[in-house]
């Protein structure tokens, strides 16, 4: 008997084995995606698989139908660096945001020049800051359309060993970014690391009377934390309140005093305020906040 015949026979046997196994578990083979999802849920209810496995299988099924636009981080929430940033400016943004990868925008903020990985700055820590040029250490930017399917994006991340991609709209303008973590969380649920608490906190204590505030923090949350009475009738967020008081879009380093509270812009770009440092009056005691 030829080797090819044996191999074909082996494939048939294996196919038959898995068909028998599938029938034993599911009784009837699913004919479409919806039936397969029902069988997966039935298997969990019958304790053939546990809840975590069920959730992961459902996650795998669902990502094939989703597009990048549905899961991306919108441009308004992207934390970026600029091509003209010096070493200290880069470090300030990295430390404040606790991220490890950053899109680097052109000076006019219209194009992504590449990605900067925080660890690539380490060699410059022992050298003169004057020799630093962000353009020399940029990684190529991966660019994908909003319409790309999530499962295909995951395959591309894996095959090319990338972790982040810039998302563009139908006109070629930057509309957001997507990371491999965003996709994996659709399958396995929230992925937490040692920095996640810092990244998700809207209000974080950094010194005795100074706090780092996300610009998107709602005024209501700020009032509850610091026992203040800032109005949210015209604006909803602390970033909106600060911009309203400035009367313009403030730049990094600008500060303003509002009712005894000092607001200093710590991260901003040409379109929005991202992070703010707030120094509270000495006689004020906020609700307990993690340092």
UniProtKB/Swiss-Prot annotation:
Alphabetized SUPFAM superfamilies for the sequence: CBS-domain pair (SSF54631), FAD-binding/transporter-associated domain-like (SSF56176)
A GO molecular-function descriptor: flavin adenine dinucleotide binding
GO cellular component terms listed in the entry, alphabetical order: plasma membrane
Primary role: Plays a role in the transport of magnesium and cobalt ions.
Transmembrane segments: none
The name this protein goes by in its record: Magnesium and cobalt efflux protein CorC
Pfam families, alphabetized: CBS, CorC_HlyC, NMB0537_N
InterPro entries recorded: CBS_dom (IPR000644), CBS_dom_sf (IPR046342), CorC_N (IPR054115), FAD-bd_PCMH-like_sf (IPR036318), FAD-bd_PCMH_sub2 (IPR016169), Ion_transp-like_CBS (IPR044751), Transptr-assoc_dom (IPR005170)
Entry keywords, A to Z: CBS domain, Cobalt, Magnesium, Repeat, Transport
Species per Swiss-Prot/TrEMBL record: Buchnera aphidicola subsp. Acyrthosiphon pisum (strain APS) (Acyrthosiphon pisum symbiotic bacterium)
Domain CBS: 72-131, 137-194
Protein family: Belongs to the UPF0053 family.
């Amino acid at each position: 008997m030829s080797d090819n015949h044996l191999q074909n026979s082996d494939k048939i046997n294996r196919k038959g084995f898995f068909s028998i196994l599938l029938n034993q578990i599911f009784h009837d083979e699913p004919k479409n995606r919806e039936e397969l999802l029902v069988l997966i849920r039935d298997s969990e209810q019958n304790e053939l698989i546990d809840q975590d496995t069920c959730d992961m299988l459902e996650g795998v099924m669902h990502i094939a139908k989703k597009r990048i636009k549905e899961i991306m981080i919108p441009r308004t929430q992207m934390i970026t660096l600029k091509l003209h940033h010096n070493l200290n400016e880069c470090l300030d943004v990295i430390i404040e945001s606790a991220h490890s990868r950053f899109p680097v925008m052109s000076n006019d903020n219209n194009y992504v020049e590449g990605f900067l990985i925080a660890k690539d700055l380490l060699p410059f820590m022992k050298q003169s800051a004057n020799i630093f040029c962000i353009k020399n250490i940029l990684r190529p930017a991966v660019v994908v359309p909003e319409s790309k399917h999530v499962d295909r994006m995951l395959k591309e991340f894996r095959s090319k060993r990338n972790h982040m991609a810039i998302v563009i709209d139908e006109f070629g303008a930057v509309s957001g970014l997507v990371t491999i973590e965003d996709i994996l969380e659709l399958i396995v649920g929230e992925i937490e690391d040692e920095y996640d608490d810092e990244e998700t906190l809207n209000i974080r204590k950094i010194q005795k009377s100074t706090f780092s505030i996300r610009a998107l923090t709602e005024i209501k949350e700020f009032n509850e934390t610091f026992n203040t009475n800032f109005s949210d009738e015209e604006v909803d967020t602390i970033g909106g309140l600060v911009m309203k008081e400035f009367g313009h879009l403030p730049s990094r380093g600008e500060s303003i005093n509002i009712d005894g509270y000092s607001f200093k812009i710590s991260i901003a770009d040409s379109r929005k305020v991202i992070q703010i440092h707030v120094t509270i009056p000495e006689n004020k005691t906020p609700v307990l906040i993690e340092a």
